[in-house]
């Protein structure tokens, strides 16, 4: 071995992350580890999977929720750059976060780059990147923002719970629009109705949610409350 030769952590892809245009196993492992960390940080349980989704809890709304469940599972299993953008809408405790986490796991396991974050945390990163006086904090936020803008699938949970400021609205538009322009896919969940979204955000954001996202309405009663009663 020539001491002048480069030494790579992954000799297969030479640390590029890709082999002949396809994601290398080393990068796949990194993305899987990162999305698992994100899910573990944000969710009470870190083992959400489609097999654990209990449709029996939905009562009269079961038939409608079966369609939602099947759509989410198919979306995750067949995810590609031709997949649609999804907007989950419905009240609290109906499984939006659970199913979005299920999608994140399957898509990541299939070798795609995935980011999963709450709207509050995601939009805060844009503000930190721009205004933080601490260089390291600003750099970390910049890395997070770049990852959210560029990953193949961005899952933005709980839109509408973030503190509404001009900066947050601007960041949300940048996130959604940049990903649309670059052909990156996004799944957004919210408790807000169409009317509430229009009242809270500007026309630019709402027109993109209306025109570029497929809406999945969630039905039923708060599952968390039902589980406490069982």
Positions of predicted regions on the chain:
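Loop/turn-to-beta-strand initiation segments
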Residues: 84, 112-113, 150-153, 182-188
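Interdomain "pre-motor" coupling segment immediately N-terminal to P-loop NTPase/helicase cores
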Residues: 2-44
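Pre-Walker A (pre-P-loop) alpha-helix and adjacent loop at the N terminus of AAA/AAA+ ATPase modules
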Residues: 13, 43-44, 50-86
């Amino acid at each position: 071995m020539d001491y002048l030769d480069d030494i790579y952590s992954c000799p297969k892809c030479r640390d590029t992350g890709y082999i002949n245009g396809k994601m290398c196993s080393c990068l796949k492992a990194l993305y899987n580890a990162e999305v698992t960390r994100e899910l573990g940080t944000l969710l009470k349980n870190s083992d959400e999977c489609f097999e654990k989704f209990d449709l029996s809890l939905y009562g009269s709304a079961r038939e409608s929720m079966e369609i939602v469940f099947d759509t989410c599972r198919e979306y995750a299993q067949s995810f590609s750059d031709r997949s649609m953008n999804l907007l989950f809408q419905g009240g609290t405790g109906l499984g939006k976060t659970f199913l979005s986490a299920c999608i994140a796991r399957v898509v990541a396991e299939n070798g795609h780059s995935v980011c999963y974050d709450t709207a509050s945390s995601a939009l805060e990163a844009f503000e930190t990147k721009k205004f933080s006086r601490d260089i390291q904090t600003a750099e970390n936020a910049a890395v997070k923002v770049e990852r959210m803008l560029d990953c193949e699938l961005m899952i933005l949970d709980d839109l509408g719970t973030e503190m509404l400021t001009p900066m947050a609205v601007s960041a949300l538009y940048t996130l959604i629009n940049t990903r649309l322009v670059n052909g990156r896919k996004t799944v957004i969940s919210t408790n807000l109705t169409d009317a509430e979204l229009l009242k809270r955000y500007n026309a630019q954001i709402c027109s993109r949610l209306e025109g570029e996202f497929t809406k999945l309405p969630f039905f039923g009663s708060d599952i968390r409350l039902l589980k406490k009663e069982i």
